[in-house]
Amino acid sequence: MPATRTLRRNRQNAPKGANREAEQLWLSQSVGYHKKRTKMYKDDILNLIKQCPFNIDTEIQISGRPPTTAHSKFLTNKEQGDWAEQIVYKSINNFSADYFAVQYGRSDSISAGDEGFADFYTEYQRELNTIGKRPDILIFKSSDFPKRNVDINNDDHVKKAVVALEVRSSSFLIERYTTFMNERQKDAINRCGAIREQILNSPLGELLKRQKSEIYKFIEEATDETFKELNFRLPSWSSTSELRDLKKLLRELKESIKTLHKRDDLSITPKMEDIALVNRWIQKYNVKHFYLQVFFDKAYVISFQDILELVSNDENEGNNFSIERDEKNQGKTTIKINVKICKEVIGRIDMPEHKSAMKELDRGRLLFYVTFTGGQGYLDNNIFMRDVINA
């Protein structure tokens, strides 16, 4: 934005009755902040995308025919997503005194098969191809809008947001999931240790040493921390009962090791194609962007900038993130960010009420899906300030 336009707008917003010196100071600080913000964020994001190993097409144009029929799963997912957005929106407005949230993403209730959906779909694609993907929630300083009268269709208002949130939902209780997975890992390690001792402290150990010395060495040197690294091909022994017993134990060991290899962390899942669309919006509005994943008991957040830095370092792949073609996400290539490296910004969520709903399609087909109401999120204001507002 030209400095003259910024000065003109800032002069109009200067405190009434301020003396000339105070007014000039206020204006200079405002313009300086605007220039610094313009330089520091959107340019950094664009540079990170250019360095990204996935060849992101920042000029991508979205096209395609609109779907013609809705499905129960889609309607349930949409209801859950809308509920998650409300949890975040209300938790910020209920627990933050200096900042407030405004719903900004598309909130249309229309779905495939409804009258006018084709026009809606075309307009949505046009929006993606011009301004990019709208975040779901914008966060503003209360001091910038004391009456909270933000006009989300006013670009100057949108550019005053301090944070943009893309809200995702997950059908898990992360506490329960984490406990289950930790116990599964512990059981698998204990089983590996028991098999190791059973082999080494019996005649089967000498038999393995003679038959497959490299496997014997792997097992002998293994610890609880290194069982996951063991990799061997199961022998096809069957000539004696001892060899069959040894083969059975080795098979059980491989199965336990396979359990240790399973991905056991939940994730935040930005789609690969969304990177370009999120960037397009950032380049227009220059607002810090975050992904926030809502589970049914907690919510976690990570910045878009951290995601880009993470995937640009191949040492992080397999531990902190993975790249998968997700059949649950319309078969699109998805970045799965380990939620353990994200910040727990909502430390508790009360469960919502849920009930069945029905949608009748034109030809008389009935779709049954789940709706969600109520529940409450409890914002961790320290993390919100440190890892979101001041990040």
Regions found by a protein language model. Name each.
Residues 122-128, 148-155, 278-281:
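Catalytic micro-motifs at enzyme active sites that drive phosphoryl/nucleotidyl and oxygen chemistry
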Residues 3-60, 72, 206, 213-391:
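Non-catalytic C-terminal interaction segments of nucleic acid-processing enzymes
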Residues 93-102, 192-194, 283-289:
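Structural alpha-beta junctions
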Residues 109, 170-172, 296-299:
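Short, solvent-exposed loop/turn segments at secondary-structure junctions
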Residues 88, 92, 135-265:
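Conserved catalytic cores of phosphodiester-cleaving nucleases, focusing on short active-site segments
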Residues 2-133:
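Interdomain/boundary linker segments immediately adjacent to catalytic/signaling cores
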Residues 101-103, 164-166, 289-294:
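A structural signal for short, well-ordered beta-strand segments and their strand-loop junctions
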